[in-house]
Amino acid sequence: MDKLLIGGGRPLSGELRISGAKNAALPVLAATLLSDGPVTVGNVPHLHDITTTMELLGRMGLNLMVDEKLNIEVDPSTIQNFFAPYELVRTMRASILVLGPLLARFGRAEVSLPGGCAIGTRPVNLHLEGLAAMGAEINVRNGYIYAEAKRLKGCRLVLDQVTVTGTENLMMAAALADGVTIIENAAREPEVVDLANFINAMGGKVSGAGTDVLQIEGVDSLSGAGLNYRILPDRIETGTYLVATAMTGGRVKLKGTRPDLLDAVLAKLEEAGAEITLGDDWIELDMKGRRPQAVSLHTAPYPAFPTDMQAQFTAMNAIAEGVGVITETVFENRFMHVQEMQRMGADIKLESNTAIVKGVSRLTGAPVMATDLRASASLVLAGLVAEGQTKVDRIYHIDRGYECIEEKLAQLGAEIRRVPN
């Protein structure tokens, strides 16, 4: 198992190209199951979760080819089984996304209950209740979901809570259902919009994506023939490098991104004292060597402040001027990075779902351990500003969501390297 060694104290500067969004690529790859022939997906990030998804599709018998530009061609016509085994699903919660398309296209699915980051209870009951309402027969036994349906029927679904993967699974299922499906209280995330765009590019009829009411008119078949669909840029990777730049007092230009998807994050960075310039597909942030000002925020579903940026802003507040109050409303148990930051000298007090962060003038390098994807990133950011060396262990979490993080940070001037344990 690898770890990262980081020497702090260098301002980040330079230019960086942003990768495709993992959280858009995973549902789009699952949605290739809906196509009646080969479909090509581009701008896919090179990440462990993507490899896992490709292995999962390959185990079902799908034919996958990757070209020199890392475009992935998926041919679902060679499918041999409808089984998603525990050993693959347990490492990645998003594996549940094959359930809806398998059921809609092939009438059956056997999918292990999911794993992924250990942040709170992220139940799949909303997925199952929605599919049952569309006419699926569902049994959960021995840790597996067994689902069957002749042809799903369109219906009106009102989700009890906002769920991104739930919205995506039900949207994919509804794409081939008989009749119209309305999903109310749907997730509005850009990645949900990207999936809707992909389904429509194959001949689907999804409208309302980006609002909280989706309407899906089921069609008889979908085809990805001649389609090369590009995944949208990763807004969380973008945000992470912007915060890293703000923390180190640097100046960085991020290219191949989507500023329009980051309003809440950019507003908080400006509040922290960053000078931000935007283009259609680039963002430049300049701290002019200043120490950031502490900011207060609370997380909520898109378009509000993203929970996936909470840990990074906790790290920024740890070395900022003033006191920042961070309230986490999306997931419970999402402050596991706090204990590790305290080992580096951060002054953070936890009260229920709130972290009160009093900025200190310096952090000191220490051995720390990653506990989940975004927590790991925040510890890397803390290491970039700490005095001395920081060792971040269990970085397989980072590899699930950040493409070559040490190479990209080194490109911006950070002292960081990956070493085997």
Curated annotation (Swiss-Prot):
Record-annotated disulphide pairs: none
**Keywords tagged on the record:** Cell cycle, Cell division, Cell shape, Cell wall biogenesis/degradation, Cytoplasm, Peptidoglycan synthesis, Pyruvate, Transferase
Describe which pathway this protein belongs to, using the record's wording: Cell wall biogenesis; peptidoglycan biosynthesis
> Which InterPro entries has this protein been placed in?
Enolpyruvate_Tfrase_dom, Enolpyruvate_Tfrase_sf, MurA_subfamily, RNA3'P_cycl/enolpyr_Trfase_a/b, UDP_GlcNAc_COvinyl_MurA
2-(S-cysteinyl)pyruvic acid O-phosphothioketal (modified residue): where? 117
* List of residues binding UDP-N-acetyl-alpha-D-glucosamine: 93, 308, 330
Q: Known Pfam families for this protein?
A: EPSP_synthase (PF00275)
Q: Does the keyword Nucleotide-binding apply?
A: no
Catalyzed reactions: phosphoenolpyruvate + UDP-N-acetyl-alpha-D-glucosamine = UDP-N-acetyl-3-O-(1-carboxyvinyl)-alpha-D-glucosamine + phosphate
A GO term from the CC aspect? cytoplasm
**UniProt superkingdom:** Bacteria
Catalytic positions are: 117
Sites where the protein binds phosphoenolpyruvate: 22-23
> Which family does this protein fall into?
Belongs to the EPSP synthase family. MurA subfamily.
Protein name from the UniProt record: UDP-N-acetylglucosamine 1-carboxyvinyltransferase
Q: Which organism is it from?
A: Methylococcus capsulatus (strain ATCC 33009 / NCIMB 11132 / Bath)
| Gene giving rise to this polypeptide | murA
